[in-house]
C-alpha cells in the first residue's frame, strides 16, 4: 500500500510538473484573465473578467484547442451567449440572450455555413 501511494504521488507530481497557471491584470490592478498551460499550450479552464470585476467569458481548452462549453456574459452579469464547443468547432445549439437574460435566438448545428459560406435561415429559432 505504501509503495502504491508513493507511486501515485510520483505520477501526480509528474503530471503537474509542466503545468503553469497565469493571471493577467488591467492597469488598474483588477484581474483580467486566468488560465493554465501545460508544456506551453493552453489547457483547462480559461476565464476573462470585465474591468468592473464581473466575469465576461469562460471556456475550456484541451491541447490548445477550445473544447467544452464557452459562456459569455454581459458586463451586468447576465449570460449573453453559450456555445457548445468540441475540438474547436461549435457542436450543437448556440444560444444568444438579451441583456435581461431572455433567450433571443438559437443557432442549431445544421445551420452552420456550408462550403460556399451560405446559411439556411429557415430553421432558426427566433424568440
Task: Label the model's feature ranges.
Residues 10-11:
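Gram-negative bacterial Sec-dependent N-terminal signal peptides
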Residues 2-7, 16-74, 78-86, 90-127:
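Periodic aromatic/glycine/histidine/acidic cluster detector
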